[in-house]
Amino acid sequence: MAALPARAVLVDIEGTTTDVRFVHDTLFSVARRDLAAYVSAHAGGPEVEAARRAVARERGESEQAVSDGELAAALLAWIDQDRKETTLKALQGKIWRSAYESGGLRSHVYADVEPALRRWRDLGVTLAVFSSGSVEAQQLLFRHTTSGDLTGLFTAFFDTTTGPKREAGAYQRIAEALGLQPGEVLFLSDIVAELDAAAAAGMRTVQLLRPGTARDAESRHAVAERFDDIAP
């Protein structure tokens, strides 16, 4: 079994706590369906205008040159590309909030996750989340699970405003925010490049091999198929 550090566990979401298919087939579908209407209804709002600036910057154009229709089309293309663009993630979070709060959307969390998180928390381990989805989207996902509200299990949530998930600096900043040394934090993810970045920052790492995730023969990270394979 993979060793658990005494102080903190930092978890990824997609492919780690949650089935990749829920993110791509359900959440992304909701975002695609509702994005154009949201952009039109909230033009001038902070999330829409931040996204407009990002699209304009990429095109080398002024914000005024990007119409609502062009903005929606560009953002839909980014969703299809699975772009980890912070402004897109913030906008998606707003769209998902409406879907969750209407009662029409419940998030998937693997059955082994909640018991393990509760066990680790009861042992005094700090729990935190690091995902490319916005903090708002993370909290919505864990608040509206089929098992109920799990947000109270976590001390902190981090998104790409902290830094890209494949850069060591982001993990160093997270450790600092938690008041810990990187070596006191265990990062759980299904993505080797993210684990490499966390390890470069000094964190301990375990790769989750959920269904559909293949083990990388060149990876040096410990592996586990379930959270209950990770023993304190």
Curated annotation (Swiss-Prot):
Top-rank taxon, per record: Bacteria
Instruction: State the pathway, as annotated in the record.
Output: Amino-acid biosynthesis; L-methionine biosynthesis via salvage pathway; L-methionine from S-methyl-5-thio-alpha-D-ribose 1-phosphate: step 3/6; Amino-acid biosynthesis; L-methionine biosynthesis via salvage pathway; L-methionine from S-methyl-5-thio-alpha-D-ribose 1-phosphate: step 4/6
Q: Where is the signal peptide?
A: none
The main enzyme category here is: hydrolase
Record field: catalytic activity: 5-methylsulfanyl-2,3-dioxopentyl phosphate + H2O = 1,2-dihydroxy-5-(methylsulfanyl)pent-1-en-3-one + phosphate
Q: Relay the cofactor remark from the entry.
A: Binds 1 Mg(2+) ion per subunit.
| Gene3D superfamilies linked to this entry | 1.10.720.60, HAD superfamily/HAD-like
One GO-annotated biological process of the protein? L-methionine salvage from methylthioadenosine
| Alphabetized InterPro entries for the sequence | Enolase-ppase_E1 (IPR023943), HAD-like_sf (IPR036412), HAD-SF_hydro_IA (IPR006439), HAD_sf (IPR023214)
Record family assignment: Belongs to the HAD-like hydrolase superfamily. MasA/MtnC family.
Instruction: Please name the PANTHER family in this protein's record.
Output: ENOLASE-PHOSPHATASE E1
Under what name is this protein listed? Enolase-phosphatase E1
Q: What is the lineage of its organism?
A: Bacteria, Pseudomonadati, Myxococcota, Polyangia, Polyangiales
